[in-house]
């Protein structure tokens, strides 16, 4: 049985994805764990639960800019979101890598 995300959990995952994308685009690397937003106290177990996750990027006009994910629960949720965010920004075969001048206009969505 899959447990739905709370609004706070969802917002936190989006913050993690955005930080991952910014680091990948601006510094051409994945962020270290300590560079990601801290998970709310008492909820770190949720971040460690194995879940599938997708990160979708859209432009300001609503057009797709990237989408990559893990459909199966093969990684802890935090790792899955970082993996999907990196993929959506840098490895979606339909699009070139996200550029630094695109970052401000991108909408980041996490599905888990």
Language model segments and positions:
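Basic nucleic-acid-binding interfaces
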Residues: 1-112
């Amino acid at each position: 049985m899959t447990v739905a995300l709370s609004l706070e959990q969802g917002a936190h995952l989006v913050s993690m994805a955005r930080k991952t994308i910014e680091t990948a685009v601006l510094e051409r690397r994945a962020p270290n764990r300590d560079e990601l937003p801290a998970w709310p106290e008492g909820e770190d177990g949720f971040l460690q639960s194995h879940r599938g996750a997708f990160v979708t990027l859209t432009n300001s006009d609503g057009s797709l800019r990237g989408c990559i994910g893990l459909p199966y629960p093969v990684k802890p949720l935090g790792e899955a979101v970082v993996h999907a965010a990196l993929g959506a920004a840098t490895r979606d075969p339909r699009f070139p890598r996200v550029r630094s001048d695109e970052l401000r206009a991108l909408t980041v969505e996490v599905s888990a």
